[in-house]
Design a protein with these regions (language model features):
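Active-site-proximal segments of metal-dependent phosphoesterases and phosphodiesterases across multiple
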Residues: 34, 39, 47, 109, ...
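Active-site neighborhood of phospho(di)ester-bond hydrolases with catalytic His/Asp-centered motifs
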Residues: 6-8, 27-32, 56-63, 87-89, ...
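Charged helix-capping and loop-helix junction motifs
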Residues: 42-46, 73-77, 116-121, 164-171
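Binuclear metal-dependent phosphoesterase catalytic core
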Residues: 91-95, 170-182, 189-234
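Active-site-proximal loop/helix segments of hydrolase catalytic cores
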Residues: 11, 17-20, 112-132, 136-150
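Core catalytic region of metal-dependent phosphoesterases/phosphodiesterases
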Residues: 7, 12-94
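Short beta->alpha connector loops
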Residues: 7-13, 40, 63, 105, ...
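Extreme N-terminal starter segment of soluble prokaryotic enzymes
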Residues: 1-4
């Protein structure tokens, strides 16, 4: 059994989590570790996560992590400390588990890693190989842990007052193909929570709420084979 600690969307407030990050084998952050995505905030985050006591740390970027989109592989390598794996449409194997991580999400204002729905974003999901145990994406798939209340749809000039599913349909199709044991995401702060669908456990690990307040707890996930148990004692 491997214990995963999952967090997302800390938006530069990771320092306030000292003492609140539980022990585990793997610490995962699924993006938006900064607020404005500048070099200083990004470097501070990687220093912080590199100091965490978990044996393995895996990170993907999110739409707020602007600087990460244009860094070369060499620049990323110089920023990411030992013991931390940064995934960008790429994978790794840790503790016998196969991971794949991608920062892209359907176009959302003028942020980083935007891809239009349809063929442009689908080509990223097509990169995900079969046999992945744990899929990490910044944004959720459509219809699962993706409800956004008071969602403003600028394309038609309407503000929705009921929860609206804003996740990616193409990602959901990819997940149906891949059938990972676990999918961890963030991005939609209001959709913090978990669900199980078609044998996959889905986690939205957003720590911040819509007001960027640290209100949610990290997820503790025990994974063994195709089984995932959520430890809710934290």
């Amino acid at each position: 059994m491997t214990r995963i600690v999952a967090i997302s969307d800390t938006h530069g407030k990771h320092h306030y989590l000292y003492g609140n990050i539980p022990d585990g084998d793997i610490l995962i952050h699924t993006g938006d570790f900064s607020l404005q995505g500048n070099a200083f905030d990004t470097a501070q985050f990687f220093t912080w996560i590199g100091r965490q006591k978990h044996k393995h740390k895996i990170v993907i970027a999110g739409n707020h992590d602007l600087i990460m989109e244009n860094l070369s592989a060499e620049e990323v390598a110089s920023m990411v400390p030992a013991g931390v794996t940064y995934l960008n449409d790429s994978g790794c194997e840790v503790e016998g588990l196969k991971f794949w991580g991608s920062p892209v999400q359907p176009t959302f204002f003028n942020w980083a890693f935007n891809r239009d729905r349809g063929p442009k974003i689908r080509k990223h999901w097509d990169l995900i190989p079969n046999g992945i145990d744990v899929l990490l994406t910044h944004g959720p798939c459509y219809g699962i842990v993706d409800g956004a209340p008071d969602y403003i749809d600028y394309s038609i000039g309407l503000k929705h007052t009921e929860p609206k599913h804003v996740g990616c349909r193409d990602l959901r199709e990819a997940i149906h193909r891949i059938k990972p044991t676990l999918h961890i995401c963030g991005h939609v702060h209001s959709a913090y929570g978990d669900d199980v669908n078609n044998g996959t456990t889905f986690i939205n690990a957003s720590i911040c709420n819509e007001e960027y307040e640290l209100v949610n707890k990290p997820y503790l996930l025990d994974i063994s084979g195709k089984s995932v148990e959520i430890d809710r004692t934290l």
